[in-house]
Amino acid sequence: MTSGRVNPQFRLEDQGIEGLGNVYYNFMEPALIEAALKRGEGTLGNGGAFLVTTGKFTGRSPKDKHVVKTASVADSIWWDNNAAMTPEGFDALYDDMLAHMKGKDYFVQDLVGGADPAYSINVRMVTELAWHNLFIRHLLRRPAREDLNEFVADFTVINCPSFQADPAKHGCRSETVIAMNFDRKLILIGGTEYAGENKKSVFTLLNYMLPEKGVMPMHCSANHAVGNPVDTAVFFGLSGTGKTTLSADPARVLIGDDEHGWSDRGTFNFEGGCYAKTINLNPEAEPEIYATTTKFATVIENMVFDEETKELDFDDDSLTANMRCAYPLEYISNASVSALGGHPKNIIMLTCDAFGVLPPIARLTPAQAMYHFLSGFTSKVAGTERGVTEPQPTFSTCFGAPFMPRRPEVYGNLLRDKIARHGATCWLVNTGWTGGAYGVGSRMPIKATRALLTAALNGSLNNAEFRKDGNFGFDVPVSVPGVAEVLLDPRRTWDDQGAFDKQAAKLVQMFADNFEQYVPYIDEDVKAVAIG
């Protein structure tokens, strides 16, 4: 039996997916919550939020992500970073997954990736879990109901958490699998209930497709000045560095919190919702995000709550530090309806420095911006990936290596060209540790970070006095109104300044060692600013 609204010429049967139980097409939020409750997938929370846990997988599994190696993509995929799967292995995986799905009920959402119709793709999401359908309905963009009657997908994603892959048969690394086949326009996800795999699979897809159209795909959040979309800012950063928090600024219009494209027309959100970390979420520091946790249909993932009152515990990380909430963009009162912006006037590269060495903000030249973009230094924050329990310093090129199917210089050259053409000012912002490394120092105060960003975005910071950083060569402001001067000089925040010097030298060497891999592919001006 099928129910819901769907193109009668584009049902699952028309795609060769047959023998399922009930298929529910394009259910809206109330029906999806009703189905999820009936199936025992979660609990109804305050305000109508939906509370779920995801079992042993509470973060992404980047090592289980595979790209099918066919002739059409063999020369364009970055194989050092993307595990290959044979076409035969994928075909066997597909057949076995469909056999596993026989007789079971499935939920289908027909959605769009990309707010700019010139560059958007149609995505069909087929999920075993009703709440996954609700999640992706929030996170991607929803077509008008009447448009569903003629919807045809460019790509299809099938997510079946109860299916376990066979590494020997399918050519994957474990029972968990995310397999992308660009020739068959198909993505298969199995063996994990973590909802973030759904959205990141579509992000990876766009990251492969858009560079061929001259569009720079970015792992970033974005906002613009009220009434002035030309004054757009983008915030690059890995999970947990502050993209969602810092872009949700009551004084600016939110374009999106995680995935964007930069075309010749400007900036556009790939998504239609947000996926925010909720650990230690504070109603005073982050009122907009906090308010979404008690709104109807918000998905609350892996949060401890009181069984009787359903009150959420924002400080209990016993399930995971990677607790999250997913909600549609319109739940943020100052969100952009169009999800479009101008060419970035300011580019902020967020890093979470667990060494406690980097300043809270630094101004970058275009060459330095290219260097730091390719380096992608940050710390993996606890819980965001399987097995990460405390901050781990890492270099993740383009501030999103797990989602970049092409070689880093493809994205780096796009960024270089667009900065040169549109004259963006670039900043490096450290949201990590100050006064010492992780375990000794403390996290950078969010009020200080917000004050520095406000000064950068309104242009006043450009008028400040700057000093040249002796370790990294970038410009650091000496004083900024509303920010303690000592905070701007990391060495002064350490009790033992000799220990700081050793730590800084260690980080400089890490930068130098990591960047060796990019030297053959970069211009002389970037080589000239290389650290170490």
Curated annotation (Swiss-Prot):
Q: Which cofactor does it need?
A: Mn(2+)
Residues binding substrate, per UniProt? R60, Y194, K200, R324
Q: For this protein, what reaction is catalysed?
A: oxaloacetate + ATP = phosphoenolpyruvate + ADP + CO2
Q: Where does the chain cross the membrane? A: none
Q: What's the EC number here?
A: 4.1.1.49
Which residues are recorded as binding ATP?
K200, H219, G237, L238, S239, G240, T241, G242, K243, T244, T245, E286, R324, T449
Q: Where in the cell is it found?
A: Cytoplasm
Q: In which pathway does it act?
A: Carbohydrate biosynthesis; gluconeogenesis
Annotated Gene Ontology cellular component terms: cytosol
Q: What is its main location?
A: cytoplasm
Q: Which UniProt keywords apply?
A: ATP-binding, Cytoplasm, Decarboxylase, Gluconeogenesis, Lyase, Manganese, Metal-binding, Nucleotide-binding
Q: Which Pfam families match?
A: PEPCK_ATP (PF01293)
Which Gene Ontology terms describe the biological processes this protein takes part in? gluconeogenesis
- The main enzyme category here is lyase
Binding sites annotated in the UniProt record for Mn(2+)? K200, H219, D258
Q: Which PANTHER family match?
A: PHOSPHOENOLPYRUVATE CARBOXYKINASE (ATP), PHOSPHOENOLPYRUVATE CARBOXYKINASE ATP
Q: What is stated as this protein's family in its record?
A: Belongs to the phosphoenolpyruvate carboxykinase (ATP) family.
Q: What the protein does?
A: Involved in the gluconeogenesis. Catalyzes the conversion of oxaloacetate (OAA) to phosphoenolpyruvate (PEP) through direct phosphoryl transfer between the nucleoside triphosphate and OAA.
| Name of the protein this chain belongs to | Phosphoenolpyruvate carboxykinase (ATP)
Gene assigned in the entry: pckA
